[in-house]
């Protein structure tokens, strides 16, 4: 028990501030920092943006395979491939085991080399600190940590096994890791404090307990039997109205108690006879992953993981205060129960617990590999919280999800995983005649389009002048108002044939002036009262250095004879449209 000392209550009390919407946090001295060129998060309307050198920055990223960045020689041929994919940012792992191979001896040659090559190739970096946990395990901890389980206690599973997983309840482990992370951040400030090649740092990777719902070690069980810390109870009492519905329901369904042990406040733990399974039969596969199973176990672990991560994060921020985030392996149809995904990680049900326990973390980022992309984005932007997608599939759906995340949910960035995998190149082009009216853009094409429109998009993010969307047969159209103009956006229709899928972003830059980007959709200007609106002019074109360069004037079939503003499914495009009014 001696290794599992309690943390300072003051740290968590400060963390309750993080539950507030970002605008309120800024007013209370929370999230926003002075503008000095250092990367920071800043509010613009309802959006939170990443600001670098005083300007908003949209991360068009790609995450390297886990081991790629461990060798500068291995990376040499990869850099040019990354540039060719129109990335502006690379997410690269930096591991505790290589930074501190011997206790107290730090080696930053690899970090220096990554930053040097990124600058040569005009790329930015987000560094991923693989410390105590990577995918719930502790494989990236130094060997001198692994061989000393007495000093660095491990999680114990319900079967008595103590796998290679450091326990988050150990303050000694947190303090030792925090020392290494602080050394890294101090070094980054020294070599990158002016150039700002490194935009953000991810602290740990997909933390949480696998193969059980919580730590069952004697020390952890002793803490589990004690009262819930007052600072965590304050979260439920003082911020009940803004809690995630799943978290609030878990507390209220157990009587909304104001004190007691973890089980008394949050309900029963995982039953002993329950066997975790990754494969569920239908329809359980579609329903169970949306439920909050054994809330007490996940809340208990979330609190302690968040507190541990905050010790590490705050140590780093004292040296160099740039945005830091924690990512989440999500509950999903293929892993519905805590332990089939890392229990206690920053999944949406316990995100508020993380924000309270880890006030140093600037945002919680979902790793999105599931079809329910928009549904889960919605969970993470609840109450105005910022969104970043650090991992996702590099699949034909990636362009669709990119436009949705950035245009609708104000994401600060998007980053498919395995961007350097030799076999993860763009999917082969499918002839339009074989696609059945479905767009088939590559990620490279989508990033190039997004790069062109980024200045305009970032200018209007957080306002009522922008929308992003995905369309399909189940959701073929919707009506929205942009800058006071009511429009209907639907699947493209031409020659009696409707597109099967569509995606895009539309921005109103004036009362009757619009820009759009995407494929497979059309826009109709709706009448308001006696005022009719119609398509005035449509030009396709490009942005060069932020300036609009028009190309073809589109009319006739390309505008359905003036009835709609069209984006054909045959290819990605940027277009400018003006509308006219008849009173």
How should these model regions be labeled?
Residues 489-499, 512-583:
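C-terminal beta-sandwich/jelly-roll accessory domains of carbohydrate-active enzymes
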Residues 1-12:
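Bacterial N-terminal signal peptides that target proteins for export
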Residues 403-531:
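Aromatic- and carboxylate-lined catalytic core of secreted/periplasmic carbohydrate-active enzymes
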Residues 74-148, 305-319:
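Aromatic-lined substrate-binding rim segments of carbohydrate-active enzymes
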Residues 27-88:
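N-terminal carbohydrate-binding accessory modules
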Residues 12-21:
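Bacterial N-terminal signal peptides
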